[in-house]
Amino acid sequence: MNENIAEKFRADGVARPNWSAVFAVAFCVACLITVEFLPVSLLTPMAQDLGISEGVAGQSVTVTAFVAMFSSLFITQIIQATDRRYIVILFAVLLTASCLMVSFANSFTLLLLGRACLGLALGGFWAMSASLTMRLVPARTVPKALSVIFGAVSIALVIAAPLGSFLGGIIGWRNVFNAAAVMGVLCVIWVVKSLPSLPGEPSHQKQNMFSLLQRPGVMAGMIAIFMSFAGQFAFFTYIRPVYMNLAGFDVDGLTLVLLSFGIASFVGTSFSSYVLKRSVKLALAGAPLLLALSALTLIVWGSDKTVAAVIAIIWGLAFALVPVGWSTWITRSLADQAEKAGSIQVAVIQLANTCGAAVGGYALDNFGLLSPLALSGGLMLLTALVVAAKVRITPMS
């Protein structure tokens, strides 16, 4: 609670909004998210070039999420009073270094090391992005500034997979990461030029954030968050081999499918507020239920290209409700400890991404093409049941 008050005090103390810094933060977030998901659309050529299976190559997503999980939990304890401006610059440098390491990787180990650097930057930056934004604009402008940040995330999610697939077919997967490194350099330059000094707190009163899990319905909510994101990554990480081998899409066709998925996600995010105004619980239970049915449809009729393409669109629309819905749940049910709850949420999501991609890859290599879909669908169904039975939503006052 003390940290929330402190953040509000800082926001109130800003005389004018620093929009250049806000957009610099948004650009960094967009680049981090884009690079995080690039392997999804480049999995097959990466695996072939490095002489590994697609399931093993998918662990490049796993290690990023795993490192990001720990980074989001412990970054504030590690950096303590360090000026946040220097920390953000460091994260932008790590983004650039990660892309270059992946681009020049001649072994699976170096690939994982590069992706681990990305995870460090991703988790730390994502955990700090909201508080950074609140210190760059007056209190009355904070919602608008935050919308810029989350808008950048939506755009990154739209373009990452299809752009990677398209460029990978033209210039090769290594040059795609070289291009991403250039974007990282732009992040460094923009942050250096626009971000003001943002001193850290000289001291903190230590509180156990995990005590929040003892509140009624909170543990169930975190379990549901874990299962929904694990289910998403169990399937989405391996969408390329599934769609190319099950439905017979070529690279161009897959690019269109991924683009459709991204656009659907953007549309779903844009209209999510209308659904959430009606019922947060219905959205949090209904979206994973629809995803479970979509996974079942792909298992049964996924060899039909039209069906597979339509399911990709439905999947994008439905899953868009999930992250927005759970953020809304935190602001409703954990409003007094929203910052700490958000830190736990980021860690849970990254752990879920790690486990989902890891188990999905193992299933793909050992149990066949449909196994990631079955795993994803099962987790989504369990999510819907947990939300319906155990998760509590505080009504909007």
UniProtKB/Swiss-Prot annotation:
Protein name as catalogued: Purine ribonucleoside efflux pump NepI
Chief location: membrane
Cytoplasmic-side segments: 1-21, 76-85, 129-147, 197-215, 277-281, 327-343, 388-397
Domain of life the protein comes from: Bacteria
InterPro entries: MFS (IPR011701), MFS_dom (IPR020846), MFS_Efflux_Transporters (IPR050189), MFS_NepI (IPR023680), MFS_trans_sf (IPR036259)
GO molecular-function term, one example from the UniProt record: antiporter activity
Lineage, top ranks: Bacteria, Pseudomonadati, Pseudomonadota, Gammaproteobacteria, Enterobacterales
Catalytic activity: inosine(in) + H(+)(out) = inosine(out) + H(+)(in); guanosine(in) + H(+)(out) = guanosine(out) + H(+)(in)
Transmembrane segments: 22-42, 55-75, 86-106, 108-128, 148-168, 176-196, 216-236, 256-276, 282-302, 306-326, 344-364, 367-387
Entry-linked Pfam families: MFS_1
Family, per entry: Belongs to the major facilitator superfamily. DHA1 family. NepI (TC 2.A.1.2.26) subfamily.
Signal peptide: none
Residue intervals on the Periplasmic side: 43-54, 107, 169-175, 237-255, 303-305, 365-366
Assigned GO CC terms: plasma membrane
Stored CDD domains: MFS_NepI_like
Subcellular location as annotated: Cell inner membrane
Presence of keyword Lipoprotein: no
Keywords for the protein's UniProt record, in alphabetical order: Antiport, Cell inner membrane, Cell membrane, Membrane, Transmembrane, Transmembrane helix, Transport
UniProt topology in membrane: Multi-pass membrane protein
Role summary: Involved in the efflux of purine ribonucleosides, such as inosine and guanosine.
Record gene name: nepI
